[in-house]
C-alpha cells in the first residue's frame, strides 16, 4: 500500500509543472501589458467622445444663437450652393438641369411659401440640416489642424549700427599754411620798408665834370 501511495505522489508531482520565480514574473508582466493596452484604448475612446461632444456642443451653440429667420436663410444659401456646384461640376442630363433650375427659382423667389421651399430642399439634399452640421464639423477640424501645424516664428529685430567716420586733420594744416603766408607777407613788407627808408649817401669821384656836347 505504501508503495502505491508513493507511486501516485510521484505521478502527481510529475504532472504539476514546477512554479519558478521567472514564470511568476512573466505572468505579472503579461497582466501589466494587458492593463496598459486597456487603459490606452479607454483613453483614445474618451478623447474621441470628448471631441464629438465638443463639436456637437459648438454646433448647438451656433444654432441656438441664430434666430429662426437667420437659420432658414443659412439653410437656403447652403442648398442653393450645393445645386450650383452640382450643375457646374457634375455631368447631368437636360432633364436634371431643368429640375435643378426650377428648384433654384423656387428657392430664390421671395413669393414662394416656406413649406414649398422646405419640400424642395428635402427633395434635393435629403436631411440638409444634418449635412450642414457635418460640413461645419469638417471645417472646424481643418481649422484646428491648420492651427496646430502652423508654427509662429519670432523675427529678430534689426539692431541699429552706428559707424564713425574718420575725421581728417585739415584745420591745423590750413592754420600752418595761413601762418606761413602771413610770415612771408610780413617779411616782404619789412624788406620793402627797409629798402625805402635807406638814407642817400653821396660818393665823391675823382673824374672832372664836363658837358658832353659835340662842338
UniProtKB/Swiss-Prot annotation:
Residues 1-72, 87-111, 158-199 are annotated as: Disordered. It comes from the Eukaryota. Residues 40-63, 167-178, 188-199 have a biased composition (Basic and acidic residues). Residues 29-39 have a biased composition (Basic residues). InterPro entries: DUF4615 (IPR029274). Belongs to the UPF0488 family. This is UPF0488 protein C8orf33 homolog. It comes from Danio rerio.
Amino acid at each position: 500500500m505504501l508503495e502505491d501511495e508513493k507511486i501516485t505522489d510521484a505521478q502527481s508531482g510529475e504532472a504539476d509543472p514546477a512554479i519558478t520565480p521567472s514564470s511568476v514574473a512573466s505572468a505579472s508582466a503579461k497582466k501589466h501589458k494587458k492593463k496598459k493596452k486597456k487603459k490606452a484604448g479607454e483613453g483614445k475612446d474618451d478623447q474621441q467622445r470628448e471631441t464629438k461632444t465638443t463639436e456637437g456642443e459648438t454646433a448647438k451653440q451656433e444654432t441656438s444663437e441664430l434666430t429662426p429667420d437667420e437659420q432658414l436663410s443659412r439653410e437656403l444659401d447652403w442648398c442653393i450652393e450645393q445645386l450650383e456646384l452640382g450643375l457646374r461640376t457634375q455631368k447631368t442630363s437636360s432633364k436634371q438641369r431643368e429640375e435643378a433650375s426650377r428648384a433654384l427659382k423656387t428657392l430664390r423667389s421671395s413669393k414662394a411659401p416656406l413649406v414649398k421651399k422646405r419640400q424642395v430642399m428635402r427633395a434635393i439634399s435629403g436631411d440638409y440640416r444634418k449635412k450642414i452640421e457635418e460640413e461645419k464639423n469638417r471645417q472646424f477640424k481643418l481649422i484646428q489642424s491648420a492651427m496646430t501645424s502652423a508654427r509662429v516664428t519670432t523675427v529678430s529685430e534689426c539692431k541699429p549700427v552706428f559707424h564713425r567716420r574718420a575725421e581728417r586733420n585739415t584745420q591745423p594744416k590750413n592754420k600752418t599754411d595761413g601762418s606761413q603766408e602771413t610770415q612771408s607777407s610780413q617779411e616782404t613788407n619789412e624788406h620793402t620798408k627797409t629798402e625805402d627808408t635807406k638814407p642817400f649817401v653821396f660818393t665823391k669821384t675823382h673824374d672832372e665834370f664836363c658837358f658832353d656836347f659835340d662842338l
